[in-house]
């Protein structure tokens, strides 16, 4: 007995899949293109913050925030991972701004309206900018403030460290923690040397004055 099969339902399903894939690809390309602009805005804001140009940096971060909100409309299925790099850079810049402004509290992911994954990795990236602030302040002999910044850097690392076990769920977190740890060691060595140098100079000055 002859046997034939209708592939109408199969074809309909594949047509739906094709339409879905085309839409996903269009959204993915839009996300990749637009997130580059957000990352650029945040990078420029970070440079301005290190130059104490907080208002100018704030304007760029406001633009970045607006762009991120619009980009969330492109996110369907698992495309949110293409938004993470932009959110991560945004978190890094915003937290740095709050530290530069000496705010009493640092924003959480809800306040910044970003994903938790991007928030935690952005925090770790910010430790690199804090390191730069520490070195800048050491050169200005702002030792007390440098120590405060180091404590902030260390606190961020200690708070995030327990999540190193979720490296398979938060891509790159373990590597970022390793980088952050090395930076803290570098800063600790530099600050110890600077402290010893200062103590020596103070002692030398004291001896010279007694003569």
Regions found by a protein language model. Give the residues of each.
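Long, charge-patterned amphipathic alpha-helical coiled-coil/hairpin "stalk" segments used as oligomerization
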Residues: 98-101, 105-157
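Extended alpha-helical coiled-coil scaffold domains characteristic of the BAR superfamily
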Residues: 35, 42, 83-101, 117-124, ...
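Non-transmembrane, amphipathic alpha-helical segments
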Residues: 6, 23-34, 49, 53-56, ...
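Long amphipathic all-alpha helical oligomerization modules
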Residues: 143-211
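Long, charged all-alpha helical bundle/coiled-coil segments in cytosolic proteins
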Residues: 58-113
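Amphipathic, well-ordered alpha-helical segments in soluble domains
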Residues: 13, 34-37, 41, 60-63, ...
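Extended intrinsically disordered, low-complexity coil regions enriched in Ser, Thr, Gly, Ala
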Residues: 15, 46-70, 138-167, 171
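Leu/Val/Ala/Ile-rich N-terminal alpha-helices, chiefly Sec-type signal peptides and the beginnings
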Residues: 2-75
């Amino acid at each position: 007995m002859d046997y034939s099969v209708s592939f109408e339902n199969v074809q309909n399903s594949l047509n739906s899949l094709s339409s879905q894939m085309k839409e996903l690809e269009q959204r993915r390309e839009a996300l990749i293109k637009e997130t580059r602009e957000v990352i650029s805005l945040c990078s420029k804001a970070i440079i301005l913050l290190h130059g104490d140009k907080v208002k100018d940096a704030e304007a760029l971060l406001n633009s970045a925030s607006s762009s991120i909100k619009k980009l969330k409309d492109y996110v369907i299925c698992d495309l949110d991972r293409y938004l993470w790099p932009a959110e991560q850079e945004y978190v890094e810049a915003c937290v740095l701004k709050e530290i530069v402004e000496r705010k009493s509290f640092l924003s959480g992911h809800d306040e910044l309206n970003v994903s938790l994954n991007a928030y935690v990795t952005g925090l770790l990236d910010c430790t690199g900018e804090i390191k730069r602030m520490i070195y800048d302040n050491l050169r200005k002999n702002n030792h007390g403030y440098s120590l405060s910044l180091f404590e902030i850097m260390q606190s961020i690392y200690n708070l995030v460290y327990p999540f190193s076990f979720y490296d398979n769920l938060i891509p790159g977190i373990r590597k970022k923690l390793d980088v952050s740890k090395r930076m803290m060691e570098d800063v600790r060595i530099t600050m110890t040397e600077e402290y010893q140098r200062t103590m020596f100079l103070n002692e030398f000055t004291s001896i010279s004055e007694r003569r």
